[in-house]
UniProtKB/Swiss-Prot annotation:
Belongs to the asfivirus MGF 110 family. A repeats lie at residues 1-145. One of its GO terms (cellular component) is host cell membrane. The chain crosses the membrane at residues 2-18, 117-137, 145-165. B repeats lie at residues 147-269. Pfam families: v110 (PF01639). The keyword tRNA processing does not apply. It is found in: Host membrane. The keyword Transmembrane applies. It comes from the Viruses. Its main location: host cell. This is Protein MGF 110-1L. It comes from African swine fever virus (isolate Tick/South Africa/Pretoriuskop Pr4/1996) (ASFV).
């Protein structure tokens, strides 16, 4: 009973935090405070660009060179349901759907409080566990307790070994060129990274998506990207004037035609 009460009290802040996440109805104009997030994943969406007289400037990333207005800039709609963030490319039919990891930059102060409460929650579980073990030891013989301790030690060692092997299998050290088996993943999120393209004589072809039309080598393909793949988080870092980190989902994306019918032509800059 005591353990249940502790769990309930310490879980309240986490539940409030989950409830606090704002919903975002389907819209073509996401809030200005979220533009940096959406334009990181959906750099080709029209709401990321300010186009005048055929010249488009990026609204978020000032170091992005102006580009000519063409079919690369697509109409998009976005929406968010707590942990699910999605944007649709509506310029083509059927609409292409992309799922991304939801932003959390608007809750920095609250996350610090939640982390403290989560620590207290963990310590509360430890306390309840110790009370239960002490109560069990008091009612059992010494031999039974020793057997229990041996089993716990064996279980702990096996779990650490399995965890270590899992981390080693999933770990991808920082590098400028990700493993070939992961190119589809990285080039879906970081499609402007140089390792996604094979450029010769000013013409660049996509290494992963064969249906991607060749494009002229220009400032869109200008980033030296470094990738980091940890067990539960994936990052890529764009090296252009200033290092810029971006987080993404680690799951392998479903193959789709993310550029088909969007690049009918490519104007040389």
């Amino acid at each position: 009973m005591l353990g249940l009460q502790i769990f309930t009290l310490l879980s309240i802040p986490t539940l409030l935090y989950t409830y606090e996440l704002e919903l975002l109805d389907l819209t073509r104009t996401p809030p200005e405070k979220e533009l940096e997030y959406w334009c990181t994943y959906a750099n080709h969406c029209r709401f990321c660009w300010d186009c005048q007289d055929g010249i488009c400037k990026n609204k978020v990333f000032e170091n992005h060179s102006p580009i000519l207005e063409n079919d690369y800039i697509a109409n998009c709609s976005v929406f968010r349901r707590n942990e699910f963030c999605t944007y649709y490319v509506t310029s083509i039919k059927p609409h292409e759907v992309y799922r991304t990891e939801c932003p959390q930059q608007s809750h920095e102060w609250h996350e610090a409080v939640i982390r403290k409460w989560q620590k207290l929650l963990t310590y509360g579980f430890y306390l309840v566990g110790c009370v239960l073990v002490a109560n069990y030891v008091r009612k059992r013989s010494l031999q039974t307790v020793m057997y229990l301790l041996v089993l716990l030690v064996i279980f702990f060692l096996l779990s650490q070994l399995m965890l270590y092997r899992e981390l080693e299998d999933k770990k991808h050290k920082i590098g400028s060129i990700p493993p070939k088996r992961e190119l589809e993943h990285w080039c879906t999120h970081g499609k402007y990274c140089d390792f996604c393209w094979d450029c010769q004589n000013g013409i660049c072809r996509n290494k992963v998506f064969k249906n991607h039309p060749p494009i002229g080598e220009n400032d869109f393909i200008r980033h030296d990207c470094w990738t980091i793949h940890l067990p539960n988080r994936c990052y890529y870092q764009k090296i252009y004037k200033y290092p810029d980190y971006h987080m993404m989902e680690c799951s392998q994306p479903t193959p789709y035609k993310w550029y088909d019918n969007l690049m009918k032509k490519q104007d040389m800059m």
